[in-house]
Amino acid sequence: MEDVPLFVLGLIASSIVAAAIGVLYSLVLPGIERKVQARIQQRIGPPILTPGFWSVLKFGYKKRVDPNAQMPRLYRSLVYFGIGIVVLLFLFTTPYWWAVLGWGSILGIAGLLKLEEVLYVLMGSQSQSFLSTGMPVPDIAKGSKHIGIKREFVEQHSGERALKMMAIGSLPLYLALLVPFAMAKSTMIRSVVAMQNPGYIMSSNWLSAPLPSSPVLFTLPGILAAIVYFVGYVMLLNEKPFSILKAKIDLIEGGVLEYASKLRAYYYIMRNVLMFALSSIFVTLFIGIPFDPFMPVMMVLNLALSLLLPIMLAALVAFSPILTFRQIYPAAIGLSAIGVLALIISLGV
């Protein structure tokens, strides 16, 4: 019982340090992604801090603008919930949280990711931007709806698409997440890390940097799962070629269109932290190097390796069109099949 207060203090301290470093680092990732993407397309690209850090700072200083929504308070609160969800998603993969009520497990990760997906459905159902409100006079142009029929808002289509993506688009990522846990024959993150990096679990020196001896990434099921995880990573970030939720050609920005000024800054924080959290989770589960605030070398290694997925994302986005559901459904089914194959192989390892 004497160790409980010390554990709680350590949990609070590690959470504050990890959250602060994670949020600040996440504001750099979009700039690196955009810079790599620009270089691939033979452009100079923006300064590294502009898409993340300076954009958040700029929108944070703008005058508050109330969004047009069916329930404005609920719509505003969704972005706050989003920040809390993605920060907890990241914290649950840090070592101190592995012993808290089983949250450092596949269930904690999958549950929070699913909550994050639900937010986009709610955003699309609530937002009613002036760009898609009903006209003050009847629209009698050829092909328009008849007078008296209720017009739909553009964002509602974004909500419907988010629901479809939540049902099948994100399935490959969850199957890929299962593979490291299946190989460790446990649902806990600690067991997955111990299987790959036993030296880290046994180490008590805060300056040590035990490297993994058998990373999941270097096995056949691990390679297959990593490929599936990366595509699922792109899907959850709503980036090309899976950015149909916010396709400029018909939905403009989708359900987040009405987020302006400070709300837009919060939305950027939410998205950027999600990008970093998913990258850090990949490094923890597939390589065996967790983000440990009390082991600086391990923390720096995790941060450095977390650049892999954003750089790969930049290369993909640089050449990708926007897919429709006619292409997304077969892609998701095919990737899910690869994920199932990796899972079956991992159970026999």
Regions found by a protein language model. Name each.
Residues 35-60, 132-158, 239-263:
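Juxtamembrane inter-helical linkers in multi-pass membrane proteins
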Residues 10-26, 101-115, 211-236, 295-298, ...:
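Alpha-helical transmembrane segments
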Residues 123-210:
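Alpha-helical multi-pass transmembrane bundles of energy-transducing inner-membrane proteins
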